[in-house]
Each structure stands twice: as C-alpha cells, then as structure tokens.
C-alpha cells in the first residue's frame, strides 16, 4: 500500500481499464463469460484463478481484444479497446512459446525492437535491448541460440523471461500473461512473478492467468479474480480476504482465519476446494453434486459487487512506438528470415544438395546410350528428362515453401499487436523463395544438363522455365501453408 502511494505520485499518467456487463458465449454452448464488470488501475498485479476450463484464457482474450464480447464493452481510459491507439498499449504473452529457435536471445529481441521503434537509431535500439536483458537477468545468455522447447539450450525459466522481454521491450501500458509459471519450478515461478511485480512498480497494469500459485506467489497479487464452471465470475477483490469470504459462506468454523498463525503461509488451493465442495448423501458418501453451484456463487458475487459509474474518456498514455515504413518492414522480415535459415545447417544442406542429387538421378535414368555411342539427338528419353525436370522443380518448390507461414503462426499472433504490414511479411517470404528457387534451378540445370549432354546455347531458356515453374510451386506452397492447420496435412496435399 505504501508503494502504491509513491507510485501514484511518480507515474502521473495513469491508466484505467474498465469492463461493463461483459457477456460472451461460444457457439452452441453456454460456456464463455457472463455478467462481468470491473475497474483496474495501473500499478496493480491481478491474478485470474479457477479450475481447468472455466474461461480464464477466454477472459484474457476478451481483455486483449482478440475476442469481441457479444454484449458489454472493455475500455481503456474510456476509449474502446478496438481503437488502434489502445491496441498499441497492450502486450500479451500467450502460454505458447513465441521464440525463433534458430536465433540467439539477443537477436530475438533485436528484430522485435526494430519492428517497433523506427524512430530510434541502431545504437539506441541495441542499448534498449541490452537494458532489458540486464533487467531480466538474461545478459549472460545473450549469445546463446534459443533452441526449441524440446531441444533446449536455455532453461524453461529463461525462456519464460525472454517471452516476457519480447513484450516489455515495447513498453506496453498493460501486460497480459497466460499461465506464465506453467512447467516451471517453484523457484523459477517466483522469479517470474517477482519480475511482473516490479513492472507494476513502474506504473504498468499486469494481469496474469494462473492455475496453482504457491503461498509466496499468491501474497504478491494485489487483486484476485475467481472464475467458476461455465465462465461465471464469483469473486473480485483482495486475495487475502478471498479465503475468509469463501469460508464464511461455506460456514467454516475458522472463517476469520486466512493466514497460518505459525508459519504465515496461505493455502490458495483451499479456495478451489471450498468452491467445488460436494454434497454428502445419507450414507456418508460424497456425491457428484456440488453444495453451491457456479450460478449460485455468481449470484452472491453480483449481490456484493459495487455499482460502477461510467468513465469519461481521458487522454491515453503516450506511445513511443513507431512502425517502420512498409519497405523497411520488408527488409527487416527478409533479414530475419535469411538469418534464421543460415543458422539452420540441416535446412541449408537439404536446400542446396536436394536439386543436384535429383538432377544426377534424373539424368542417369534418362540417358539412353545406343551401341554406336551417346548422342543427344538420338536420346529417346529426352522428352522424359524434360518432363521429370519440371516435376522436380514443382516438387522442390512446394516442399521448400510448405512450412514458411505455418511455423510463424504463433509469432504472427504476437506481432498482431504491432499492427505491421501483412503485405511486407508475405513479400519478404516470396522474395526469399524467388531467390532460393533461382539457385536450386541453376544447380539442377548445371548438373543435369551436363550429364544429359545439353549444351549452353539454351541455358537461359532452361533456367527461366524451371525457375518460373519452381516459383509458381512456391506460391502454391505458401497458400497451403496459410490455409491448412497442420504440417502433416500440408505434406499429404503436396
């Protein structure tokens, strides 16, 4: 509370996030979010708790604008969340890993910063990246490749902090996190939540979806939202007081005790136990019927909820982000894509050796040698060679572009908040594939035509023909990568 007083004086440009009568239901289902209203201010660390499938992630998606509620509204300083200026003040760290595994820790942050701050020089961007690495205790691993979640080169806790850093480098006013402690040890979990607590001291509003917090983590939260089955909010208030609130309704004998008098610990699991308590039948056996249903808990919450007043629009906090031009975005996307490919040695070997090897196989299979010696004009299989060359160009063009977009889907989900040019991203992919297809077509012609005995007179014609065929296959592969939902489905289609 003392810190909050100092923070209010230090951060005069405060934000107010409000929700009024939010209603959302999934198609053919009552699950979603029901009758939820709230006021949140900057400098708060808010926890969303509840059992599995109660709608915690759905609520986060409503708050960050990914899901539009059927009724009600979410506003930032009185401005609707759909306002582009509001979108740029929001940071979202989903549960999925959003790192580019081939790049280093520094490079992941470097390219994100370049896409956010066109008004800064490269030296200023580098200083900003180094500062965030120091703040999040990642400077010692700055030159390590991130690796995949399965084949790790950095720890799980470091990966979580790096995912958070990708959002913090944009300096958002509001930061949402979906299960930031999942899969982490208790020590790493506390480090992550302490990091988020520090962000609230800098004037940010942080909202966290969390499942099973420890006692130490639970006591760090300033505000608690509890959801029950079906998406019903059942509590909004002080985390410590939540335990006595539910004990009192459930008629516990120690309903005034929330903290252990001996060790000072809190048991957050007790809240979920009380909420989900089952009735006992006449034989003393536990039934599957709850003592208090989710709708009854919700009615109690609504009865105790204060009346919210309408908020008049006030100026939004200044936003220091500046998008690069469309051309600059194209260059950054292209550079990032090339850097990613160059660090993947396996990819390079396949991309550069695939077509020469296929050229050798095709040429040897179609090289017809009669008894009186080989002659190109006497080769009965020349038409077959031409046909198979086109098939190879089509196959390599499809295979090399098949994963270009689908593997970036989680990354694009995060960059959606940056409001970058989709055309620049797609153009960078097409230009890269155009170049790699030119190299592959050239290698096939040099090796295959040499073995089959075709002279250099028609070299340019052969190259343009196979290059165009391969590039058309590239475009088809990009369409498949964008349209289909799994890599398996893409390769089956190919």
Task: Describe each model-derived feature in a short phrase.
Residues 2-37, 42, 51, 71-76, ...:
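Topological signature of polytopic alpha-helical transporters
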Residues 64:
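Helix-to-loop junction immediately C-terminal to a conserved catalytic motif
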Residues 68, 73-86:
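ABC ATPase NBD Q-loop/coupling interface
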Residues 96, 101-118, 128:
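Q-loop/switch helix immediately C-terminal to the Walker
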Residues 167-168:
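ABC ATPase C-loop
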Residues 171:
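Conserved catalytic motifs of ABC-family nucleotide-binding domains
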Residues 175-179:
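Catalytic Walker B motif of ABC-type/P-loop ATPase nucleotide-binding domains
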Residues 234, 246-264, 277, 342-494:
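Membrane-spanning alpha-helical segments of multipass transporters and channels
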């Amino acid at each position: 509370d003392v810190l909050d007083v100092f923070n209010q004086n230090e951060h005069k440009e405060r934000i107010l996030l409000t929700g009024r009568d939010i209603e959302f239901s999934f198609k053919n289902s009552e699950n979603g979010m029901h009758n939820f209203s709230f006021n949140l201010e900057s400098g708060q660390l808010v926890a969303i708790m509840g059992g599995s499938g109660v709608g915690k992630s759905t609520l986060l998606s409503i708050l960050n604008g990914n899901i539009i509620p059927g009724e009600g509204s979410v506003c930032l300083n009185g401005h609707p969340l759909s306002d582009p200026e509001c979108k740029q003040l929001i940071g979202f760290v989903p549960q999925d890993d959003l790192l580019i595994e081939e790049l280093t820790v520094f490079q992941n942050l470097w390219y994100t910063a370049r896409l956010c701050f066109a008004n800064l020089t490269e030296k200023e961007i580098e200083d900003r990246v180094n500062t965030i690495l120091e703040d999040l205790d990642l400077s010692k691993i700055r030159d390590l490749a991130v690796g995949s979640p399965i084949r790790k080169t950095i720890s799980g806790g470091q990966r979580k902090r790096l995912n958070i850093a990708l959002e913090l480098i944009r300096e958002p006013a509001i930061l949402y996190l979906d299960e930031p402690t999942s899969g982490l040890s208790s020590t790493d979990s506390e480090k992550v939540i302490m990091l988020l607590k520090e962000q609230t001291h800098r004037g940010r509003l942080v909202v966290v979806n969390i499942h099973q917090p420890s006692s130490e983590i639970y006591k760090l939260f300033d505000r608690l939202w509890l959801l029950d089955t079906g998406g019903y909010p059942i509590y909004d208030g002080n985390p410590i007081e939540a335990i006595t609130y539910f004990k009192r309704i459930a008629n516990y004998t120690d309903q005034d005790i929330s903290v252990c008098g001996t060790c000072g610990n809190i048991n957050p699991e007790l809240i979920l136990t009380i909420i989900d308590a089952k009735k006992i039948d006449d034989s003393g056996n536990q039934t599957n019927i709850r003592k208090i249903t989710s709708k009854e808990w919700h009615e109690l919450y609504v009865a105790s909820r204060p009346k919210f007043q309408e908020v008049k629009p006030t100026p939004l906090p200044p936003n220091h982000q500046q998008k690069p031009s469309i051309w600059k975005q194209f260059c950054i996307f292209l550079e990032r894509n090339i850097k990613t490919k160059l660090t993947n040695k396996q990819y390079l070997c396949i991309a550069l050796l695939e077509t020469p090897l296929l050229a050798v196989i095709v040429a040897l299979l179609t090289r017809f040698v009669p008894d009186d010696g080989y002659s190109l004009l006497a080769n009965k299989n020349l038409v077959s060679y031409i046909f198979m060359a086109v098939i190879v160009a089509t196959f390599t063009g499809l295979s090399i572009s098949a994963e270009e977009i689908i593997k970036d889907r989680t990354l694009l989900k995060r960059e959606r908040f940056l409001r970058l040019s989709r055309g620049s991203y797609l153009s960078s992919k097409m230009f890269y594939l155009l170049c790699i297809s030119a190299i592959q077509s050239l290698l096939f012609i040099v090796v295959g035509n040499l073995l089959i005995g075709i002279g250099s007179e028609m070299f340019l014609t052969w190259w343009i023909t196979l290059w165009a065929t391969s590039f058309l296959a590239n475009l088809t592969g990009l369409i498949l990568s964008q349209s289909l939902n799994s890599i398996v489905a893409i390769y089956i289609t190919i």
